[in-house]
Every structure is written in structure tokens, then in C-alpha cells.
């Protein structure tokens, strides 16, 4: 799967400003600017980055008239990727606050709110999340959708409509999050997979935990994915139980069914509490299998090692450094936003990265860490980016950060978001157009 070209029938989107000819004096991260460091000029043509040259620093006569934009050293990233959201739960904490700490209390509270999930309610909250994501610079958003019965839930149909409406602004993917036990029945596994496969942007998923682990069910799920040509995204080992084996089993079955590059394990918290030999052996298998990891720092920090009246000792963050060292594709996501699982937050991968810099000691944040919030490759939705040349000019500019060096943007608010070089969120400051 590859991202669709930017196009939309939405009037406000179509009426966006003219495409600049050159973005001058941009600061790119090292991971997508392999040549000599320094400010760059990005030359745009036909909605793509045609070439990148070193910024000479000299004034360009009539630059504004030619449609050039001067960024004055502002950081620029390719379009952001939100690899893991829960749009069906977002913005419901006022209706469904958890009664206690931890994952199980959050699940109970969220289930209690499902009586309120009408089509209008689901659509309104999802549209709010999509608008927030667009303003953050997100181009691809994958949401997990609670699915506890054989037939697809109402949210699945609502999000299919929204996917079509938002195409060209945000590519919306939907993953069913179902109890693994539903896949014990091979026929039901095939039925669910067929429904997912018939949905544009559909991805097959399940909740895999030590309390419900079933090798047979996971095998049926992976076999169905292979049969229907589906990608897979599992809530795997979202716990701090050393005996959890969901990630290891997934890697083994991904190899068996030839699913390299099509499987992601989200959370994978248990790796952080396993003995080094077990954890690293699992990561070696993940690397060989071509499985990706999605780290979700906000909810893992909040829900793992959570006990009333006690300060948590453990972070619940998966082994990000060790995974990257093995060439495993890694992405960072926002996960839950203002619901029973996380009462705060927003749909913004940059916020997730800022939290991961602290929780997982990711550095340098801009030159290396930022790759983890632009990584559609980790979702099986494109190749790994090493250069912007030839790619669509889907960019995120941080114009409030005219800082020298290669530090993290001084101000990540007030972003300017481009699709095909055209501004779809934010506005250029007057000095950029002078």
C-alpha cells in the first residue's frame, strides 16, 4: 500500500494557497538529508520535491514575487504518521472516568461508555480528532476500533465513510481490536478477515495478552491475514508480565506465513521486564521476521505499574534502542486521547516524540528521533524515507523555531502543513513572504 496523492473535493482544502516554488533556508533532520549538514533550499515542482540544494545565504531578487518562501532556518519534517489511535474512544473521559488505576479499570470504564456510541457521536469525535491531526501535520492515521462481536461494529462503517471524505488530507486506516479468543474459531477468523479485507485501509488486529494467549487463535489470525493479503497490527504484550510471549509468537508465525513487512506489534511492554537473554532473543526473531514495533509512551507510562497510593517504579516502555539497533522499524504513537485510558493528551505525534525523548532517552531528538513519527514504513505503507527528493511535497514546517544548530524545534506550535506543496493548515508569517 502507498499513500494516495493529495486531492480533495473539500472546498476549504481546494482553496488553499498557491504552491511555493522554493522553500528557502529549511533545516532538515539528518535521517532524510544524508549530504553535508546546513540549511537547504527545497525546490518544488508538480507537487513534489524536485531537488534539494545547499542554501547560499544570499538574497534572491524578487523571491517573493516568484512564489518563494524563506524559512529562516525553520525545521522541516516530512508528513507525520500517527501509527496508533483510538478514535472510537477519544474525548470521552468526561463520560467514562476510570474507577481505579491501570489497564483493566480503563477497559471497564470504556466498555460502559459504548452505549453512547451512536453514529453521530462517533463521527463528531472522530472528525475532531482528524482536524487536530491535520493541524499537527499527520498524513496517515491508523485507528484501532473495538470489535467484540462477529459482525463489524457501527464505528467501522462510520470510519469507512470518513476515510473517503478525508482522502487527500489524511489517509485513515482501521484495525479491529478484538479479543484473541474470537480467532479460536477458524471460520470466524476468516469471516472477520474477509470483512476487513473488503474495507479500504483495513488492517487485521487483536488484543494479545498473557491472560488470553492462544497459539491456535493467533495462528488462525495470521493464516487469515496471509490468505486475504492483509496487514496485521496487534496489541501485543501490553503488560509487565515476564512470561508474556505474544511478540515472540507473532514473530514466529509471521515468518511461517510469509508476512514480512506486513505485521506490527503495538505496545510490547513486557520486553522491558524480561531477562536480557529472553528479550533480546525475541527482538532478534522480530528483526528476522520483518515485524515492526509501535511504542506508545503516554498510555504505557500511565497504565503500567499502576497501583493506588503508590508511585510507579517501571516505565512500561518497550526496548526502542535495542529494536532500532537491530534494524527493526519503530514508530511512536499517541494512542488514547482524553478517554478512560488517558485523561489528557492530543492527537499529535510530535507530542508523543517529546514524551519518548524523556521516557526512552531518545536523542538527538530532531536528527534521529523525529524519524519515528514519520515512519509509514513501519506500518507497511511505503518505503523507508532517506531523502525527500522525488517525494510528494507533504511537509510540516515549524516556523516559530528560527534556531541555529540542529536542536529540537524551539516552538512546535503554529505549524504550517503542506500537501503537494500547498498549505492546508497554518499560515506563513509575513517575514517568510518578504
What do these predicted regions represent?
Residues 154-168, 184-292, 309-332, 385:
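Histidine/acidic residue-rich metal-binding segments in metalloenzymes
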Residues 252-263, 303, 314-400:
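His/Asp/Glu-enriched, well-ordered alpha-helical/loop segment
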Residues 368, 372, 388-434:
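C-terminal cap of metal-dependent C-N hydrolases
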